[in-house]
Regions:
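A short, well-structured alpha-helix characteristic of acyl/acetyltransferase catalytic modules
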Residues: 1-39, 43
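Conserved catalytic-core motifs of GNAT/GCN5-like acyltransferases
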Residues: 120-124, 139-152
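Amphipathic alpha-helical recognition patches that constitute DNA-binding helices
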Residues: 14, 85, 89, 102-103, ...
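Conserved acetyl-CoA-binding loop-helix of GNAT-fold acetyltransferases
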Residues: 96-110, 130-131, 135
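Acetyl-CoA-dependent GNAT
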Residues: 35-85, 91-93, 144
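Conserved beta-strand-loop-alpha-helix junction that forms the acyl-donor binding cleft
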Residues: 91, 110, 120-131
Length: 154
């Protein structure tokens, strides 16, 4: 069973490790793959996402009963979608154990608790996570050759 963990700045080593891992970030290959997250960027990122979310952002780590961080969940207001966009990333070594489904359920519950009524996700058309989102109640809103927009009413 996973729990949500509000990371401290010192915990951002885990986010850096996930974003630098090619297997974890394979879903992002359409947008460049791995993402640099150097320590000098942590303070600004933390201020924006954690310290001052302004009702527009939510971010948590997924934490296993063992105490290991296994992924992240987040949502943020995306003007191009006209609503809140979901984010679920499970660190590759922890995939295949139901963490993505559990993380998505935790994200939807947190968003609903925070007054969000609809969540969207734009997913690369070749991303196998589409099946996960559809199995959890998301529906296809629109599609292009490159991506699919999914939506769930909370």
């Amino acid at each position: 069973m996973l729990s949500l963990y509000l990371p401290e700045k010192k915990d951002l080593w885990f986010r850096r490790a996930m974003l630098a891992d090619a297997q974890t970030m394979a879903y992002n290959r359409a947008w460049g793959g791995v993402i640099a997250f150097p320590e000098e960027d942590w303070a600004d990122w933390y201020a924006y996402w954690i310290a001052c979310p302004e009702g527009k952002r939510f971010y948590r780590y997924l934490k296993a009963e063992s105490g290991d961080f296994v992924g992240e969940i987040a949502y943020h207001f995306d003007a191009s979608l006209g609503g809140f966009a979901a984010d679920v990333i499970v660190f590759a070594p922890y995939r295949g154990r139901g963490s993505g489904a559990e993380g998505l359920e935790l994200l939807c519950a947190a968003a609903k608790e925070n007054g969000v009524s609809v969540l969207y996700d734009d997913i690369a058309a070749d991303n196998p996570a589409i099946a996960l989102f559809l199995s959890r109640g998301f529906v296809e809103e629109s599609r292009t050759a490159d991506k699919i927009i999914l939506r769930i009413n909370l």
